[in-house]
Amino acid sequence: MSNIPSELKYASSHEWIRKEDDGTYTVGITEHAQELLGDMVFVELPEVGDTVSAGEDCAVAESVKAASDIYAPISGEVIAVNESLEDSPELVNSDAYGDGWFFRIKPSDESELDSLLDAEGYQAVIDEE
């Protein structure tokens, strides 16, 4: 069973989002998602300054098994990307909720967070797969 931290919010498409102290949000993929994908070999990140909409594909995680689109859980402006993933995509596998984050976003509509899942809701999504 995958680790699902209770302090995060989740999208049914297997992204997590965490609010930071400065009001921005960090986005990554869940431990469950990286387990399904297997060993990461390449990550394509959005550009800093990109504007993304909730549900829009904005990054790609490529593993030995498949390439998978990564979706923005909320709308906003990309303010940082995890450049460490360019040289070390395996961080997504080893630390999905920490050093394996994908990008940070400055939200344009925080009410979109209300449509995301809590840990229990995300577990239910996994159980239905």
Curated annotation (Swiss-Prot):
Single GO biological process annotation from the record: glycine decarboxylation via glycine cleavage system
Keyword list, A-Z: Lipoyl
Cofactor note: Binds 1 lipoyl cofactor covalently.
N6-lipoyllysine sites (modified residues): 65
Protein family: Belongs to the GcvH family.
Quaternary state and interactors: The glycine cleavage system is composed of four proteins: P, T, L and H.
Record's protein name: Glycine cleavage system H protein
Organism expressing this protein natively: Shewanella amazonensis (strain ATCC BAA-1098 / SB2B)
Underlying gene: gcvH
